[in-house]
UniProtKB/Swiss-Prot annotation:
Membrane topology: Lipid-anchor
Stretches forming Sequence repeats: 81-92, 93-104, 105-116, 117-128, 129-140, 141-152, 153-164
Residue positions of covalent lipid attachment, annotated as S-diacylglycerol cysteine: 30
Parts forming coiled coils: none
Record's keyword annotation contains Signal: yes
Signal peptide location: 1-29
Ranges of Gly residues composition bias in the record: 72-81
GO cellular component terms, A-Z: plasma membrane
Region described as Disordered: 33-168
Protein name: Variant surface antigen D
Function per UniProt: Responsible for the antigenic diversity for host adaptation. Expression in E.coli of a construct containing vlpD, vlpE, and vlpF yields antigenically distinguishable products corresponding to each gene.
């Protein structure tokens, strides 16, 4: 008797979780990802397959443009309300601009990667931290500029490229 009650509660909890997870996916597929409908004014421009609503001053045409102000709402719903634009991704945080990735944090701009943190810009890499920029592309950002490397920390600059800009 106890087991059936527990399994019913588990089933109800799982059903609620699936329902909550399905709502933002439906919203993303309909193109209305900002659930509270209160967009902040800004000049964000997005390109190509966009599911996140951008309201900051970032543009997705070449990495981060330096704006890291704003907040994100909705966890993995793709709803963003400040300084972020992303394409085909799920969980983004403030100030990031990325393509085909999953978990991003403030100030990162990357492509085909998984875990990024504040101030990093990288392409085809895995673990970055604040202020580092690891890239095999031409777009560099604040802090440091690294090319074709994997793990960088704040303020470091390892590069085999000719373009190195330290903005901080």
């Amino acid at each position: 008797m106890k087991k059936s009650i527990f399994s019913k509660k588990l089933l109800v909890s799982f059903g609620s979780l699936v329902t909550l997870a399905a709502i933002p996916l439906i919203a993303i597929s309909c193109g209305q990802t900002n659930t509270d409908q209160s967009q902040q004014p800004g000049s964000g421009s997005t390109t190509g397959g966009q599911s996140g609503t951008t309201t900051g001053t970032d543009s997705t045409t070449g990495g981060q443009t330096g704006s890291e102000s704003g907040t994100t709402t909705g966890g993995q719903t793709g709803t963003t309300t400040g300084g972020q634009s992303d394409s085909t991704s799920t969980s983004k945080e403030q100030g990031s601009s990325d393509s085909t990735s999953t978990s991003k944090e403030q100030g990162s701009s990357d492509s085909t990667s998984t875990s990024k943190e504040q101030g990093s810009s990288d392409s085809t890499s895995t673990s970055k931290e604040q202020g580092s920029s690891d890239s095999t592309s031409t777009s560099k950002e604040q802090g440091s500029s690294d090319s074709t490397s994997t793990s960088k920390e704040q303020g470091s600059s390892d590069s085999t490229s000719t373009s190195n800009m330290n903005t901080r």
